[in-house]
Structure formats: C-alpha cells, structure tokens
C-alpha cells in the first residue's frame, strides 16, 4: 500500500531539514555583468597575457617557461598546453579570455597531441582583429562566417599539399622537429616504431639511468578504462596500476553481486590484485567492487570490454590467450559464479586510465598465442573490406608486436619531466604524421595557403573582413618563430612568400631552404587541428556582447569584542 503525504507534512519536514542543515549560513552571491567594448578589451588582455607566455616557446630557438607548483619542485617546460593550463588570472574578465584560449590548446592537444603553441599563436590575431573590426561597426556573425569560409579553404589546401610518411627517416625527422630539434629523441621514437609498427603501442615512463632507453614488452592495449574513479590507486595521476595481477574475462554484462564475489574471494586468498573485464556492470556488482576497494582495501578494478559484437568477442579471446585466462561466454558454458583459480589470466603489470587499459607481460601459453596469430593471418588473407583488414591488423599487432616503452633518463626529476613533455609531443606528432601525412614546417605550409584565399568570393564586406583576418593570422606562426630566433619576422615572411612552394625559413641555422628536403616538416593533422580549433574558439569569442561573472566574495567583518574589565581604577 502506498502512503500518501499531504503538503503540510512535507512542508514541516522540509522546514526541519533546512533548519538542521543551517540554511541561513549559506550565502548566495550576486553576479557582475559587463557589456560591449569594455569587457571585450578585458578579455583580450587575458588572451594577450596567455599568448605572450606561450609564444616564447615556439620554434627551435624558443625558450622554456617555469611553472611554480604548490607541492613539489617547479616545472620547466616548452609544452604549449602545459603553459596554458598553468595560467590563472586574478581579474575574472581577463581570466575568461585566457580560459577560452586554454580551451583552444586543450582541444588541439586532445585531437592531435601536438601543435598547442601554434593554436594559441593563431587564436590571438583572430580574436584581436575581430574585436577591432567589431568596434568599427562590423557584424560579428558575418565576420565569423568569413573566418570559417577561409578556414575551410586552407584545410583543402593543406590536404592537397600533404605528403605521406613512408620511411623511417621521415618518422625520425618529424619526431626530431617536435622534440625541439633533439635528434636522440627522434631516433628513439623511430626505433620504437620500427619494432612495434607504425600503429603499435608506445608508452613513455621515467627511466632509472641518465640515458634514454627503449624497452620492448609483450603486452596488449585497448581503448577502455576503469568504470569508476574510485578504483584509482596511483599517486602519479588518475590511473590504476597493479603488478602481478589476475584478470577475469566476461563477454556478458554482470548483473548481480553473486557473480563477482567468488572471484574476489579467490583473488584475496592468493593475495593478488584482480582486474575484471566485462561488457558492462549493473549497479549492485559495481557497488560491491567499489566498497571492497575503499573499505577493505582489496586491490580490484572493473573495466569495460572494448568494441561490440563479434569484434569484442575476438578481442577478449585474444586477451585470454595472451594472459592464459578462460573466456566466459555462452558457447563454452563457463559462468562467472563457477570460476576457479584456472579461470584467471595473469599479467606482470597492468596500467589503466579513464580511457585505456594496458596489459603487460601476459603469462599465456605461447602455443595458444601462435594459434591465434595464425588464425588472424588466415582471416587477413580473405578479408575484403578495408575496415575488416584494419581491425585484423590491429589485433595482430597486439598479439605479435608487444609494447614499446620509452624510458626517459636524466639527472633530476625536473629534467626528466621536461624531457618527457618533449617526448610525448614528438610521439603524438609522429603518430599524426603517419595518419595524415606531412607538410613543410616552420609555418611555411600556412603561408602557401594564403593565395587560395584571394580566390574566395565572400557574400558581403563583413565576410571579406573575416577572410582577411585569417590571411593575417596565417603569417603569425612564421613571424613568431623568426622573432624568437632574433630576426624580423615580417622580413622573413616577405622573403618566404616569394620563394617556391616547399621553401621556408630554417630558424635554427638562419637560412632559407627546401623544408621537405631539410627535414623541417609538420604533421598535416597537427596544423589542420591547430587552425580549426583556434579559429572556432577565437571567432566565437568575438561574437560575445555580454559577460557574466560572480562578484567578489565579501568577507564577514571580524566580531567586535567588549573591552575587558570596564571598571574605574
């Protein structure tokens, strides 16, 4: 029988609740609203501050930026997104402008893994020129349309200009440029790709010596992470790390706590961490796993299986073979409730983030692994679609090639962290180059796209302004690189524009060269994403007419105390 409540009863209970929570102690602060040119000027100041800090890192003669940290030593870096994230301005309206450019760097980093400084350098002139033209009466919406029209044209030009990366030398060149000219890093990444393939798994870790090293470990990686952040156990970031762990596989969704309790008991009896990989988890079993992790301290983590349908089944079978586990599904009549010690796969190390899982040093039977590899090769010979071939090659790489680990050495934690930033940038840039090809570096590729903008036919004068804004922005990366090398950027750009299509400015040696032949190249994807993200956010920024912020919180005045005593002496 349902119990009905009348409104007086609900009101009284609500009042008691509010009284119990001391709602009067909560204070709701007013908002500050600013409009027009004044607030746009403040936002642009924030953009300038962030861009100034980021610009100095660009190019082979760019310098480092030091970030103070509340805990631990200061961080020294040339990584654009790291510098951008480290900026937090006191003025809230300036900070909004800075935050929007931070968003540009973050998006570029997520999509391409590199090019964050280029994105920041491009965002500033787009926002600045947009604001100036709006103050003269131009329509911000039409300006944005012109900007996006020009960007689409540039992207087409970059695609036509792009050349595929085929050789190990080209891979090394891309990695070297992205690592700020460090040839040792370029060679290290090229060697890693030669060992595990262009699409192989490569990770970066702290080394234990003064030198950088390459280690090849047999392992598997897939794009699914932990189901809940409550499983995180690492103090080096939001990730789960276990050694000598057991792995349990299930193709089906886990609905009941009774399905996971036997596995927990077995893992606990062996005093080993437990990794469960299943299609999905209902609330009850997930709660049991989280509570056992938090309250009892059992080392356990739940992960969703990768893919769907037949691909998920094959991926789990591959993992089970590589780790020596039993795959639970309907065909072999194995249930999670009936799992035994032999049901578990075993790995020497497991690293799990919110987006990926890496199983290292699997202890599977070599004969079973070879059978899986042979089976995949047979399927590869008969595959007809490119999609199926890509999936099969991906599975083959996981089973056959293993994982390349780049161990970065140095004299101190500060030095190692700075070098790791450059290695990660170089690795991401190299992957992007393999994916979409390369274009002349040093800002030359963007300069070669300017003539195509002259052929565009904008619908009105305000759209023409948007196109001209992009023309000016495309010159900025080359200008910045030359300026950081101590030369007049405008003069350098003028000379490069009069040269052949593959020529540009070598800032390291102060000479004009064929950029492709000299190995000064940029991944097409990095340049494309930098321009796309910068123009999208910066042009949206110019369309803002009002900004709303919280007003500064007023501190309560100190209590007034009566004087002690008070009598006459």
UniProtKB/Swiss-Prot annotation:
Subcellular location: Mitochondrion
InterPro entries to which the protein is assigned, alphabetical: Chaperonin_Cpn60_CS, Cpn60/GroEL, Cpn60/GroEL/TCP-1, GroEL-like_apical_dom_sf, GROEL-like_equatorial_sf, TCP-1-like_intermed_sf
A GO molecular-function descriptor: ATP-dependent protein folding chaperone
Main location per the UniProt record: mitochondrion
Tissue: Testis.
GO BP, sorted A to Z: protein refolding
Pfam families registered for this protein in UniProt: Cpn60_TCP1 (PF00118)
Transit peptide: 1-29
Assigned GO CC terms: mitochondrion
Stated family: Belongs to the chaperonin (HSP60) family.
Miscellaneous note of the record: Shows ATPase activity.
Subunit: Forms a single seven-member ring complex, in tight association with the p60 protein.
Job of this protein: Implicated in mitochondrial protein import and macromolecular assembly. May facilitate the correct folding of imported proteins. May also prevent misfolding and promote the refolding and proper assembly of unfolded polypeptides generated under stress conditions in the mitochondrial matrix.
The protein's name: 63 kDa chaperonin, mitochondrial
UniProt source species: Heliothis virescens
């Amino acid at each position: 029988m349902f119990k009905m409540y009348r409104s007086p009863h609900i009101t009284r209970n609500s009042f008691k609740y509010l009284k119990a929570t001391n709602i009067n102690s909560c204070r709701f602060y007013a908002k500050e609203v600013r409009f027009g040119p004044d607030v746009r000027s403040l936002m642009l100041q924030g953009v300038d501050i962030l861009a100034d800090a980021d610009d100095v890192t660009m190019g082979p003669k760019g310098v480092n930026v030091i970030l103070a940290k509340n805990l631990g030593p200061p961080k020294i870096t040339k990584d654009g997104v790291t510098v951008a994230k480290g900026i937090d301005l006191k003025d809230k309206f300036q900070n909004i402008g800075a935050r929007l450019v931070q968003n540009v760097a973050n998006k570029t980093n997520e999509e391409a893994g590199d090019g964050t400084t280029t994105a920041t350098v491009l965002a500033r002139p787009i926002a600045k020129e947009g604001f100036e033209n709006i103050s003269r009466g131009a329509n911000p919406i039409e300006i944005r349309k012109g900007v996006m029209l020009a960007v689409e044209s540039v992207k087409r030009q970059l695609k036509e200009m792009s050349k595929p990366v085929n050789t190990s030398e080209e891979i090394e060149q891309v990695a070297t440029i992205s690592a700020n000219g460090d040839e040792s890093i370029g060679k290290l990444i090229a060697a890693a790709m030669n060992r595990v393939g262009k699409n192989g798994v490569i990770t970066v870790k702290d080394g234990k010596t003064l030198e950088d090293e390459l280690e090849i470990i047999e392992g598997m990686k897939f794009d699914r992470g932990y189901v809940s952040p409550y499983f995180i156990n690492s103090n080096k970031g939001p990730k789960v790390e276990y050694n000598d762990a057991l792995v349990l596989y299930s193709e089906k969704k886990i609905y009941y706590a009774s399905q996971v309790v036997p596995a927990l008991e077995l893992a606990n009896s062996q005093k080993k961490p437990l990794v469960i990989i299943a299609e999905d988890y209902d609330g009850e079993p997930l709660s049991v796993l989280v509570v056992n992790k938090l309250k009892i301290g059992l080392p356990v983590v739940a992960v969703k299986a990768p893919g769907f349908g037949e691909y998920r089944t094959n991926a789990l079978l591959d993992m089970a073979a590589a780790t020596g586990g039993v795959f639970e599904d309907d065909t072999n009549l194995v249930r999670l409730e009936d799992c035994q010690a032999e049901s578990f796969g075993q790995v020497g190390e497991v690293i799990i983030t919110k987006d990926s899982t890496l199983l290292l040093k699997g202890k599977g039977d070599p004969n079973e692994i070879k059978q899986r590899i042979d089976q995949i090769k047979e399927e590869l010979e008969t595959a007809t679609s490119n999609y199926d071939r890509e999936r099969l090659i991906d599975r083959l790489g996981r089973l056959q090639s293993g994982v390349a680990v780049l161990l970065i050495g140095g004299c101190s934690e500060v030095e190692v962290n700075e070098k790791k930033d450059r290695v990660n940038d170089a690795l991401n840039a190299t992957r992007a180059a393999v994916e979409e090809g390369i274009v002349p570096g040093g800002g030359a590729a963007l300069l070669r796209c300017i003539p195509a903008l002259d052929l565009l036919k904008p619908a009105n004068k305000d759209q023409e302004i948007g196109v001209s804004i992009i023309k000016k922005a495309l010159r900025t990366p080359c200008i910045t690189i030359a300026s950081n090398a101590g030369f007049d950027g405008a003069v350098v750009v003028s000379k490069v524009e009069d040269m052949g299509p593959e020529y540009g400015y070598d800032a390291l040696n102060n000479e004009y060269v064929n950029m492709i032949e000299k190995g000064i190249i940029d991944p097409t994807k990095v340049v494309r994403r930098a321009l796309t993200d910068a123009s999208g956010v910066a042009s949206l920024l110019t369309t803002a007419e009002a900004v709303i912020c919280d007003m500064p919180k007023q501190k309560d005045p100190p209590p007034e105390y009566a004087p002690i005593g008070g009598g006459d002496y």
